[in-house]
Every structure is written in C-alpha cells, then in structure tokens.
C-alpha cells in the first residue's frame, strides 16, 4: 500500500510543479503587461505635459518625429528601431520641463551665458525623467541623453563621437536641427527650406552622421519632408475644408507607431 502511494506521488509531483510554474509565469506575464500599460500611460502623460507647458514645443517634437520617421524608413530601419526613433523624437526635449529651465524657455530675451549653461543640462534632465521607464524602453533615455552629441565629438553632454552616438540620436539630431532652422525661435527667424537643406549639408561629417545626411538630402526624402512641412503649416480649418472638397494633397505616408495623438551648419543657439 505504501509503495503504491509513493508511486502515485511520483506521478502527481511533476504535475503539481508544472501547474505551479505555469501559474507563476501567467501571473508574471499579467504583472508585466500591466506595468507596460502603465509605462505607456506615463509616456502619454509626459507628452501631454509637453503640450501644456509650451504649444510651440509640442508642435516641434511632433514635426521632428515625422521627419525622423521619414529618414529612418529611408534608411531601412527595422520596426523596433523605428519605434525607438519616434519615442526619442517625441521626448527629446522633455528635460526642458524641469522647473529651473521652464522660465528660461518662456523668456523671450537672448540667452545669457549662465542660461546657456543651464539649458545644456536638459539632455541629462530628460534622461533622468525617463529612467524609471528604462525596463520597458531601454533605448529611449540613451537617445534623449545623446541628441545633442555631434559626429566629430564636440557635442554635449558626453562628447561622444561617430557611431558611439546611438543611432536613434543621430537620426533625431538631423530632424531636430532641420525643424529648428525652418521655424521661428526666440533667438532667430525661420529660414527657408533651401537654407535648412544647405545647413544640414554643411554639418555633414562634423555635426551629423555623413551617411544619414546623404540620405536626408536625397530627392525622395526631401520630397517627403517638404510635403510634411506643407501639411504641418496648413491651418486645421483649411485642411478640413480641403478634405471635404477633395482638394487637399494626401498627408505624408508616415504612420506614428507609438503615439495615438500624432499630428501633424546651424547656429549653436538652434541646437539648444
């Protein structure tokens, strides 16, 4: 009888262990899924904060995301990397929401040397804000931290050079500078598409990844960038009216991969 019970236990024990393991894995999966949803919700909240703090900055990061995705797709980046590029573009200036920097960016006067030094801390501050999400978005903070690095190693905050700069940051750097040149800032007027194109070309191999610059300046990519700019500058009411009459050009063939709310040599100040 005792031997029979032991034999039965030998059969039951593996089943019990297997069931317990399955249960633990299921609970772990549910907890991770919940944490991922909370992380995504946190990113959405941060994007809302960017909009609420400065509508101009909100428009800027969305345009940068659009241009970065155009360049990333042309470079043949895989879907995961494109997700990362988009997130870095949308949150590259999140560090500017730090209390010590908010007043500086809302002040319309020219930056003082002290203010310039303070502004240059925004990549680190942004990476710090995003650090709690690094378990789910490990490349996001790295890209935000490096978006002001330069190909020749003279950027900040760490002076990274060449391909030591994360790819997502190299892509976003070009898109960020292009948008800064073509839109009015507190310290400069908006310049033309042609001026911006020449400035990006001038930064090839010094400020920017030369291969990405070649791609950005190729006719197919520039055509998409130009189309995206026209779409972004068109007033919302006019867009709706044109769509009703069937007169509007289609929006650029770019799909935002993360945000459900997608919208539509440079001077040193322009890189802040």
Residues covered by each model-derived region:
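Non-catalytic interface/linker regions that flank or bridge core catalytic/transmembrane domains
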Residues: 1-49, 246-272
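Metal-dependent catalytic cores of enzymes that make or break cyclic nucleotides
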Residues: 52-62, 66-261
């Amino acid at each position: 009888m005792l031997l029979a019970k032991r034999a039965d236990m030998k059969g039951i024990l593996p089943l019990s262990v297997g069931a317990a393991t399955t249960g633990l894995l299921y609970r772990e999966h549910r907890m991770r899924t919940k944490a991922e949803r909370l992380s995504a919700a946190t990113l959405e909240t941060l994007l809302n904060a960017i909009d609420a703090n400065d509508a101009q900055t909100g428009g800027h990061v969305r345009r940068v995301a659009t241009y970065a995705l155009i360049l990333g797709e042309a470079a043949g980046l895989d879907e995961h990397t494109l997700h990362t590029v988009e997130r870095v573009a949308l949150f590259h200036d999140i560090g500017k929401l730090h209390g010590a920097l908010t007043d500086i960016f809302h002040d319309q006067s020219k930056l003082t040397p002290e203010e310039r030094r303070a502004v240059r801390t925004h990549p680190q501050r942004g990476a710090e804000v995003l650090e709690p999400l690094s378990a789910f978005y490990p490349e996001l903070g790295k890209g935000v931290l490096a978006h002001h690095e330069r190909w020749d190693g003279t950027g900040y905050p760490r002076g990274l050079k060449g391909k030591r700069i994360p790819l997502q940051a190299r892509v976003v750097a070009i898109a960020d500078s292009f948008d800064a040149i073509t839109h009015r800032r507190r310290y400069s007027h908006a310049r033309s598409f042609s001026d911006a194109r020449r400035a990006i070309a001038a930064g090839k191999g010094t400020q920017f990844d030369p291969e990405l610059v070649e791609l950005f300046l190729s006719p197919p990519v520039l055509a998409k960038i130009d189309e995206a700019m026209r779409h972004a500058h068109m007033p919302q009411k006019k867009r709706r009216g044109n769509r009703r009459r069937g007169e509007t050009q289609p929006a650029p063939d770019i799909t935002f991969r993360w945000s459900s709310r997608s919208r539509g040599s440079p001077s040193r100040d322009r890189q802040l």
